[in-house]
Amino acid sequence: MVTTTDYFDSIQQHVSVIPSDVVDKVVKIWRHEYQKHVGVGKRVFIVGNGGSCAIAEHISTDLNKRCKVKALTLSNNSLLTALTNDYGQENALVEWMKINHFDKTDFLVAISSSGKSKNILRALEYTHNCLASTFSIFGMSGKNIFPQYNYDHSYIHIDSFNYGVIELTSEIILHGIVESLVIE
């Protein structure tokens, strides 16, 4: 059994090893890309499943409200279930990206605590085919899967098998990005 002290120590340990150079690289890419494409529909698509989807929605809200960045998540339940029914769960995100005319001027943020979500991997592959930029955060077994789908190598692997630790660390990373992009 894990004590709360052990749990908090684990979170602190994982936060202390966040590679700030990767986070800074993502902020730099977002700033550059957003300035380059301002006025032409530059958007940030954020995808995840379960708790990662909740994080995606939270960060999307902050990017829209605090940073004036057009951020989207697939949080429309009727659309999600329709796409899942028609195209399968593994293809639903790609179909959503197509409906929203995702292109090379857009940016994808992918969050997968398990590190093996097929729909997230397909979204990354689709993003690569569109020549767009990506940033991924993943945990657990993703260490051996996700890097091959992150063609521009902007990713962070959270080396834990605890969903709570992965999700909290993911959210801290993304809040760090938001804080770096806030427009006063």
Q: Which role fits each region the language model picked out?
A:
Residues 17-20, 24, 76, 180:
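Polar helix-capping/helix-linker motif
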